[in-house]
Amino acid sequence: MVLKTSQKAGSFLLALVMLLSLTSVFCFKSASAATDGEWKYELENGGVTITGFIGTSRTISVPSKVNGQRVKKVTALNNNNTKASVTTVSFANGIEEIGTGVCKGYISLERVALPDTLVTIGSDAFFNCSSLTGITIPNSVTTIGTNAFNGCIALISADLSCKATVIPDGLFTGCKSLTTAALPSYTTDIGVAAFSGCSSLASINIPDTVKTIAKDAFNGCASLKRISLSTELKTIGEMAFKDCTGLTEIFIPNKVKTISEEAFSGCTSLQNAYIGSSVSVIKKYIFSGCTALKNIVFGGDYYNFTDLSSTAVTGTYTYYPSKYADGWSHYDVVNMKSYSAPTSVAISGTTEAAPGAKVTLKVTATPAGGEFNNVYVLKSSNPNVAYISDDGTIIARATGITTITAYTVSGASASVTFSVTPDKPQNLTATAKTTTSAELTWKEIPNVTGYNIYRSTSKNGTFKKVGSATTNSYTDKGLSKGKTYYYKVACYVNSDGKQALSAYSSVVSVKAAAPAPAQISAKKA
């Protein structure tokens, strides 16, 4: 029995040793932290995650590979005092994620180069990089974390032409040197204090996809004189534009439902506020401290005037559509007047332009004679093709097609298609190939989708499209022998399912006939 017990004990100890051995091996494999030159890294998810930089260079170039493995993620760089001296950080193509706080507190960092493969920028990634002057977010980025550039006090410009739909909380809070910011065309939400304290921000284009502007989003943007709000906007948060002391006018679009507390309080230069017909909830103190406010013009028939009354300013007049006069008579808000609200609007003028051209469209509201018929906003569906300047001028930027829409405070609107057209084809020639075909050639136009070819049987007759080409030549077949044909060509760019068509080339003619035979010489035998 004693022998058997000893055998059992020995077997148990042997099994325990083997288990501990396997466990230690397993633990070693899971703890894959390693170093390769200046880089600390871990292997995970089929790639490398860089967890630290142990070099001393002031210029850091994060590689695409470490120890032969592709770098996918960076979670940390300098974790010591040398980070204060780093001036440049570049991330190689292939990197998909920059983690939380990677460059936080790099106070000497002046330049950052982000890769075209980047998808995610973590929270606080460049927090308090107080020497950074500019940033371009690649198109590939879909997610930006909160406070990513918070406290970058030297930042002048930010290009966020990426796929992110949310501008996160605190993204540029305290970036007091920021003058311009291009938001993603996919943006739906602008987060809490996203641009709070950006006191040099002079202009910003809010895409028409934005539905929510959160609390304090633009609080303290003292240089903003005018802002064009999204036509899809539904909610303006508390103190969203508080202390925007340069703002002189605001137009609330016709899908906004709620304007929250103190939304425009402290806007000491604000003179006119136009509030769209869709607004049904107006919270307290939205115009508190707006000492220059002259007119509040409503476009609709219902507002919470009890809350609005607490924002009354001496000398301010409130206007409402005359058809709702009886409904407002019992409210004691501020000086009230009625006006003839536009019921329709029309746009006229040139709707084609070359890149770089400036165009002014005429907007006419009816019935004529309304006090605010000249108050409207213009919007471009594709600002990359043409955008609207602060004075309402349309600036043609690149070939394509956009829709220009005019909106009035009462909700009336009208749209026109606006084309930015390429240069017309030059040096068109036509040569008879056979008795039934002709070859056309012309000078190639760069950056166009293709060319349309038009034919007529008389120079001043009706031209009909006979074909298209993607190169600068075309052979027209099926002609009648001995007949003269006239041709012209236009080039085009595809845009939003339509063609932005250039002006026509000059007209050329050709007679369908076999080309003359080559001269033949022969010697007498």
Report residues per predicted region.
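Extracytoplasmic soluble-region selector
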Residues: Y339-P422
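Pro/Thr/Ser/Gly-rich low-complexity, intrinsically disordered linker/stalk tracts
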Residues: P422-N447, K481, G497-A525
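Structural signature of tandem-repeat unit edges
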Residues: A9, T23, L43-N45, G55-K72, ...
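Consensus positions within tandem repeat domains that build extended binding/scaffold surfaces
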Residues: T100-V102, S123-A125, G145-N150, P168-T173, ...
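Sec-dependent signal peptide cleavage junction
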Residues: L22-G37
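Beta-strand-rich modules
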Residues: D476-G497
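Extracellular low-complexity, O-glycosylation-prone stalks/linkers
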Residues: N447-K465, K488
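Short beta-strand segments within Ig-like beta-sandwich modules, predominantly Fibronectin type-III
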Residues: V385-I388, K465-T470
